[in-house]
Curated annotation (Swiss-Prot):
Positions annotated to bind Fe cation 1: E55, E85, H88, E169
Source species of the chain: Azoarcus sp. (strain BH72)
GO biological process, one term: ubiquinone biosynthetic process
Family per similarity comment: Belongs to the COQ7 family.
Role of this protein: Catalyzes the hydroxylation of 2-nonaprenyl-3-methyl-6-methoxy-1,4-benzoquinol during ubiquinone biosynthesis.
Residues spanning the signal sequence: none
Protein name, entry field: 3-demethoxyubiquinol 3-hydroxylase
Gene Ontology terms, MF aspect: 3-demethoxyubiquinol 3-hydroxylase activity; metal ion binding
Catalytic function, reaction form: a 5-methoxy-2-methyl-3-(all-trans-polyprenyl)benzene-1,4-diol + AH2 + O2 = a 3-demethylubiquinol + A + H2O
């Protein structure tokens, strides 16, 4: 039990503080940088910071859910999704730096809150656990779609990253439902949307 706690704590430290690494090529890495003005760069960096925070939260959610799951198949799916989210973390981190931005100062807070929510979701059983995963991915997909509408049209690098992230999130949601995830009640989905709105608003600025 103590060894497991050390492993989970190490995951948290690496997610929040260590540079993320990607196995897959970074989407748009071969696309030349567009000549964006200072305001466009600031805006794009802020949107990518929001996406980076979303991936921090995803790592914590999946970690919390995996800790509480009693089904090896569910844990494996959570770990697979987590690995892809780590790549998203690396992509957004790189793009933020290229745009001259910075990561959120509140990342430890986002991580801690999402970990607690993930563990709480896991306590309700694997079907609800998977349903929570599916709904999370749907909401992330929706907010990534909105970012494609808000990013500067010429920022093809950021757009390529967001498009690939969205594709991955759709796949995660579909897999969770195929594994038996249940649709969450409307009040729960609404509460998740409200929490997401608070996070995205704060992360855009801080």
């Amino acid at each position: 039990m103590f060894d497991k706690a050390i492993i989970e704590f190490d995951k948290a430290l690496r997610t929040v503080f260590a540079p993320a690494r990607s196995v897959r090529p970074v989407p748009g890495d071969d696309v030349p940088d567009a000549p964006l003005d200072d305001e466009q760069k600031r805006h794009a960096a802020a949107l990518m910071r929001v996406n980076h925070v979303g991936e921090i939260c995803a790592q914590a959610l999946y970690q919390g859910q995996a800790i509480m799951s009693g089904d090896e198949r569910v844990r494996e799916e959570l770990q697979r999704a987590s690995h892809e989210e780590t790549e998203h973390l690396a992509w957004t981190e790189q793009r933020i730096a290229e745009l001259g931005g910075r990561k959120s100062l509140l990342n430890p807070l986002w991580y801690g809150g999402a970990l607690a929510i993930g563990m709480l979701a896991g306590r309700f059983g694997d079907r609800w656990n998977l349903g929570f995963l599916a709904e999370t991915e749907r909401q992330v997909e929706a907010h990534l779609t909105s970012h494609l509408e808000r990013l500067p049209a010429d920022d093809r690098k950021s757009r390529a990253i967001v498009e690939q992230m969205r594709t991955d999130e759709v796949e995660h949601a579909e897999t969770a439902l195929k594994l038996g995830g249940r649709e969450l009640p409307l009040p729960v989905r609404s509460a998740m949307k409200l929490a997401s709105r608070v996070m995205t608003t704060a992360a855009y600025r801080v």
